[in-house]
Amino acid sequence: MLAEAKRIRDRFDAELRAIYVGEQTEETSQTFREAFAQLQLPIDSTIYYEGGGEPAEAILRALAREKIGLVVAGALEKEVVLHQFLGNVARRLVREAVCSVILFTKPQVKPKALRCIVFIADYSEHGLQALKTTLPFAEAESCERLYVIRIITAFDEARASIGSNAADPRDNKTNDDEEDALEKFVLSAGATEVPIETRCIRGNTGLAASDFVRSVTADLLVVPMRKNIRSLPSNIAWVTDVIPCNLWVIR
């Protein structure tokens, strides 16, 4: 996990700090020094020892107290055929952390490049800034394909079907309108060398997006999420339970 965190540190030219849920002992201090040295990290890197209590609470407390901008953690509690389920700590980080979160499903000592990335678009200002943050990261990862997708559920389409009675005509969009809006959203993020493909994903529920992520064998799913909002929109709420690949929640 520390190797994956170092990769993220390098991508953002940031300072790496560690959170350890437990008491500081000479043994744990030595273990960290050895791990830091192996990864060519400063051996005096900051470690927050959060002794006692429930792990998720301890981590959330440290993130808020130290004003951390991004936390990198492991994702999985269990895995069954075709589905990977978030562990309790990871789930609470996604819902409650005051900062951005990156979760790795299978962290590796020698991290592999994230060649295929899926970004879930929303047309808010935060969503646009999140895409602008994703583009240089994807370029640094030598991303071969960045899918920017818009999730359209049966509920969304039912709401649009009564658009003629809606106060806002933008609620009544045709398929072409949706595709055009998504293209304009991507173009507004600026130029990039990363190959981008836009897709409108339709399904009865937002889980259709999870199916799409698996179908393209994505390495990373990126989800914009505004700060101080614990409840994800219904069409992407599934990411707090089933995680199809590594996950980056941008706050």
Predicted features and spans:
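Structural beta-alpha unit
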Residues: R7, E23-E27, T31-V71, L187-L221, ...
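Well-ordered, non-membrane alpha-helical segments in soluble/globular domains
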Residues: E178-E183
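Conserved residues at the C-terminal ends of beta-strands
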Residues: G74, I120, I149, R202, ...
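Amphipathic coiled-coil/heptad-repeat helices and related helical stalk/stem segments
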Residues: M1, P55-A56, L86, A130, ...
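Gly/Ser-rich helix-loop-strand patches that form or flank binding pockets
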Residues: I59-K110, D211-R251
